């Protein structure tokens, strides 16, 4: 699975931490989430998006990364940091938790 990252400070912070192995927890049967430690930098980053399947976001109030596998409504608390390319999101569209490794190509 590949992803195209946004051109913002939060996405750059995420990429700077790669490789990164995490457990993605299913949340609301809509997204997979994890909590980076420390939280990703969101200072000066534009907030607000209506996530589509494949969007990689940060939920600002909690600091978690959320990868949406279903469409969701507009939220001013979401920050878009990237999108999974093509139909790669299908691999995450399963119930339960998954352990994944994020790497640079």
Predicted regions and their residues:
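Loop/turn positions that initiate beta-strands
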Residues: 53-55
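Compact, glycine-rich, soluble single-domain proteins
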Residues: 28-50
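Well-ordered alpha/beta subsegment
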Residues: 81-105
